[in-house]
Structure formats: structure tokens, C-alpha cells
Amino acid sequence: MRKGLIALIALIAICITIGAASAADWSFNIGSDTNSDGGSVQINNNELKIQDEKFTIPDGYKENESARDVGADGKGNFEGAKVSVCELKKGNETILIKVFFADGGIHNITAPANSENKTIGGHDGFLITDDGLFTFDYGVNEKVVEIVASNESAIEAVLK
């Protein structure tokens, strides 16, 4: 009887060890800087890094942490891609920065009909002005960056 109890305890200990080792490869930290889908968002002082693309956080802006999204399913023009998002706020002003990425990369970006070709911060892309918002999209390193702000100068500040 005693040998059977010891064997049962040993078997349970082995199962727990195997289960813990298997779970080590999974990320259970929802809202963390990285996740198992490959998404990443990091902030260090006034530098924001999303999917290894660097941005400047303009003076006075702070992250709205509840709006952070890491490796979520992309929608709209980038269906099938993942997206990591960071929202910066200063009073009533908001800057939304999204980086879309996919396993095979994103290679073709089509300019929307209502956009104009524009170079901001050294990046060639497309600027859309609609209902008081400015949206700038550009491709970099097989990813697509989208920045939405209430004015073009805020986009320029992010891309310095």
C-alpha cells in the first residue's frame, strides 16, 4: 500500500513538472509588452518602439495604457495581418500609432482614392485628411505604419 502511494505521488509530481515545462513557452500576460503572436510595444522615456519601429513621444503626451493592443488581428485594408497599437494623449489631443505586420511581410500598399502622396519624417507614404483627422500610412521593413492625429505637425513630431 505504501509503495503504491509513493508511486502515485511521484507520478503526480512528474505530471506537474511536465505541465509547467510545457506552459513555459506560452505567454499568459495579457497587456504585456510582448505576446506569443509576435507583437511588441515598448516605451523608454520619450521613445516608443512598436514591432522594432521607433517613434518619438512628443513633449506632454502620455500613453493611454488601456488602449494598448499587442499582436491583435488586423482589420480593414490589412486583413490577415496582426497589429500592435499605442495611443498617446495630451489633454484633448490624441495620437494613435499602429504597426501592421504579417508572417510573410506586407509588400504592397495601395493609396486610397482620397489620399495624397506625402513625405513626412523621411517616410514616403499617403496622407488622408478626413473630418479633422490626419492619417499617414507608409511601408517600412515589410510592415505598414499608420499614424492618426488631429494635425500634421503631431505626425511630424512622432517621426522625428
What are these model-predicted stretches?
Residues 1-28:
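Secretory targeting signatures
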Residues 4-10, 47, 87, 158:
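Acidic/proline-rich low-complexity IDRs
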Residues 17-22, 51, 57-58, 138:
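Generic detector of short, well-ordered, non-transmembrane alpha-helical segments enriched
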Residues 33-131:
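Short, solvent-exposed recognition patches
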Residues 116-160:
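A short, solvent-exposed beta-edge/loop patch
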